[in-house]
C-alpha cells in the first residue's frame, strides 16, 4: 500500500530540490527590487520513492517593504535626565540602534551614518549584520548632528533619523562636544544642586590649585551615558578625576564602579567625595566595614577632621551636617598600599561616634607584579551641601584637594 512520505520543494531561485516532511514553512525570498515575482513548486513522494510528475506551482508577486531604523530605547539622553536642552559630551560618543523589516531583518544589508551633513558623499557604510552601534572618537568641539539610515538588499532605504531631533520633545535640541581642558576632570554627580552652588565652590578650588579654567567639568545629571565605552573614554582623557556626589541621594557613581576601577587600574587618580556609601563591596575601594557616625543625622560645626599627613591640612566642619554619614575601615588585603588621610577627632558633647574613626583613605592596587595602579581616595564627609561649603572652618576645605593634585597624585 502506497504511503505519502514527504515532499520536495523548490523556489525559482533555487538550483536543487529540497526534501521535507513538514506541511508548511516560512521562507525568505531574495527580493532585489521594489516589486519582484517568485514561483514556488512542490511535489509529493511516497514510500516507493515515486515522485509526483506534475508539481503544484504558485506564482507570487512580492512587493518590497522599506526597512526601519531607530535609536535604541534610552540610548540618547532625555531632557528630564540632563535638565536642559543641550546634551554635553567630550570627544567620544557612541550611538546604538535597532533595525526592523517586514521582509525579515536579514534583508537589511547596510547601515549608513553621517555627521553634520547628509550630502551624497558624506555617508559612511557599515555592515548591518556586524554593527548595531558606532563609537565616534576625536570629535571636534562644538555643536553636531548625527544622521543614520538603513538599506535593504533591494536598495530600499529607511527614513533618516537624527540626534538631536528638534521634533522629539523628550530629547535635547542640541548636542555639544566640549573641548578637553587641562588634565583634571571635575565630575558633578549632584543632580539636586540645580543652582550649581557646589560646582562653583569646587571650580573655585580648582581655579586656585590649577589656574583659571585649567580643568574640565562634567555635569552628569540623573543618568550616566548609555554606553559604558563613553564613560570610560571620558575618564581616560584625564590624569586626575575629582568626583563629588549628592548630599541627599540621587548620585550615579555606584553604576560607574567598573569604569572607575578600570580607570584607576590603568594609572588614573581619582578623589571620590561620597556623602552616602551605598555599598561595602566597592570594587574601586574595597571596604572591610562601614558604620554610621551620627545615627541621629547631625554632626555639629566646629568638629575637626584630623589629617594624618600634616596638621596644616586639618579641617573643621563649618556648618551643620544634617544627613547620616559613615566612617569606614578599608579592606587592606585588597590593596597593595593603603594610607589613612583623615580621622574624626575625639567625640565631643552630643557626638555619637566613638574613638577616632577613619573618614578618608588613599589606596593603590597591584595591577601586575611590577606595577601599581593609580591612586583612589575615598572621603565620606561631604565637602558641600549644595548651599554652603561644610569643611571651611579652618581655612578652605579645598586645601585638601590642592594637596591631592599637587602632591599625592604626582
What would you call each of these model-derived segments?
Residues 1-13, 100-118:
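Solvent-exposed loop/turn segments flanking beta-strands in beta-repeat/beta-sandwich domains
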Residues 16-25, 122-130:
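Short beta-strand segments within Ig-like beta-sandwich modules, predominantly Fibronectin type-III
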Residues 29-37, 136-143:
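Surface-exposed, short loops/turns at beta-strand junctions within beta-sandwich domains
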Residues 38-44, 144-150:
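Hydrophobic/tyrosine-rich beta-strand signature of extracellular beta-sandwich/beta-rich modules
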Residues 45-51, 151-161:
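Short, solvent-exposed loop/turn segments at the edges of extracellular beta-sandwich modules
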Residues 194-282:
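Helical hinge/lid and interdomain linker segments adjacent to catalytic or ligand-binding clefts
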Residues 247-345:
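A glycine-rich, often tryptophan-bearing local segment used as a flexible ligand/cofactor-contacting loop or short
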Residues 350-410:
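Extracellular ligand-binding/catalytic regions of CAZymes and related secreted enzymes
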Amino acid at each position: 500500500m502506497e504511503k505519502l512520505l514527504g515532499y520536495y520543494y523548490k523556489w525559482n531561485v533555487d538550483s536543487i530540490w529540497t526534501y521535507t516532511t513538514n506541511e508548511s514553512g516560512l521562507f525568505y525570498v531574495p527580493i532585489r527590487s521594489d516589486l519582484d515575482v517568485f514561483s514556488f513548486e512542490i511535489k509529493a513522494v511516497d514510500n516507493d520513492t515515486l515522485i509526483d510528475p506534475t508539481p503544484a506551482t504558485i506564482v507570487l508577486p512580492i512587493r518590497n517593504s522599506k526597512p526601519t531604523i531607530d535609536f535604541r530605547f534610552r540610548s540618547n539622553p532625555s531632557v528630564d535626565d540632563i535638565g536642559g536642552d543641550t546634551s554635553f559630551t567630550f570627544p567620544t560618543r557612541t550611538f546604538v540602534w535597532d533595525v526592523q523589516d517586514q521582509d525579515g531583518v536579514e534583508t537589511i544589508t547596510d547601515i549608513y551614518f553621517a555627521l553634520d551633513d547628509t550630502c551624497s558623499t558624506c555617508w559612511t557604510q557599515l555592515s548591518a549584520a556586524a554593527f548595531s552601534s558606532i563609537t565616534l572618537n576625536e570629535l571636534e568641539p562644538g555643536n553636531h548632528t548625527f544622521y543614520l539610515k538603513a538599506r535593504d538588499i533591494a536598495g530600499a532605504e529607511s527614513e533618516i533619523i537624527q540626534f538631536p531631533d528638534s521634533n522629539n520633545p523628550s530629547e535635547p535640541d542640541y548636542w555639544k562636544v566640549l573641548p578637553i581642558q587641562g588634565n583634571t576632570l571635575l565630575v558633578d554627580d549632584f543632580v539636586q544642586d540645580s543652582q550649581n552652588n557646589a560646582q562653583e565652590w569646587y571650580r573655585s578650588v580648582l581655579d586656585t590649585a590649577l589656574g583659571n579654567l585649567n580643568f574640565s567639568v562634567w555635569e552628569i545629571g540623573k543618568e550616566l551615558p548609555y554606553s559604558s565605552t563613553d564613560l570610560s573614554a571620558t575618564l581616560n582623557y584625564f590624569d586626575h578625576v575629582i568626583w563629588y556626589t549628592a548630599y541627599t541621594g540621587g548620585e550615579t557613581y555606584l553604576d560607574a564602579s567598573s569604569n572607575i576601577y578600570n580607570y584607576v587600574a590603568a594609572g588614573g587618580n581619582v578623589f571620590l567625595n561620597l556623602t552616602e556609601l551605598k555599598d561595602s563591596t566597592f570594587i574601586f575601594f574595597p571596604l572591610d566595614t562601614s558604620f554610621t557616625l551620627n545615627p541621629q543625622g547631625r554632626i555639629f560645626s566646629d568638629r575637626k577632621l584630623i589629617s594624618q599627613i600634616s596638621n596644616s591640612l586639618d579641617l573643621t566642619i563649618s556648618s551643620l551636617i544634617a544627613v547620616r554619614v559613615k566612617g569606614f575601615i578599608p579592606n587592606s588585603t585588597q590593596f597593595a598600599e593603603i594610607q589613612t588621610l583623615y580621622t574624626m577627632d575625639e567625640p565631643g558633647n552630643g557626638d555619637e561616634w566613638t574613638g577616632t574613626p577613619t573618614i578618608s583613605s588613599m589606596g593603590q592596587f597591584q595591577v601586575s607584579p611590577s606595577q601599581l595602579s593609580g591612586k583612589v581616595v575615598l572621603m565620606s564627609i561631604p565637602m558641600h551641601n549644595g548651599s554652603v561649603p561644610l569643611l571651611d572652618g579652618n581655612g578652605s576645605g579645598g586645601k585638601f584637594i590642592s594637596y591631592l593634585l599637587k602632591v599625592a597624585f604626582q
